[in-house]
Amino acid sequence: MKKVSEIMAQDVVTADPSLPVPEAAKMMLKEDVGCLVVMRENKISGIVTDRDLLACMAQGHDIQKCSISNHMTSPVVSVPPDTLLINLAKVMAASQIKRVPIIDGGKLLGIISFSDIADDMDDQVADMWSEWLQLVAVTKTSAQHRRGRRFNKQNKSHARITH
């Protein structure tokens, strides 16, 4: 079983809690990320997602006056790097979250998304299918070879009878 440390993204985009919502949206767009980990004094104080920013606008807030601290999720669900992917997937499903920071000794090491886990599982499933197809091919070739030997024996036997 894989651990989160094996597939986590190590480049985490962080932001100060006072960052205005429009600046956060620009940062997410520029960095091509769906969330920012909000840090206060080198500690995680929250996480804000693109959906949180959309909700802020949809609720009619004056986004020029809103900071991300007003719309972030806190406290943050986080896990250590040795957490098994399957266990993290269960936590994410139970908590209904899509992104989880990876923390060790209070230090932010990375972040992992549900799609990272799904992509990795797709790779694992593809590998299993590949192995299975190879096994089927070997088994089929072996079975054809055995049938061929039987057919040859039957023909030789038949040939002896007719001569």
Segments the model singles out, each with a brief description of its role:
Residues 1-11, 49-78, 84-93, 113-163:
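Tandem CBS (Bateman) regulatory domains
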Residues 14-32, 79-96, 103, 121:
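The conserved cystathionine-beta-synthase
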Residues 28-31, 36-51, 92, 100-115:
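A glycine-centered beta-loop-beta connector
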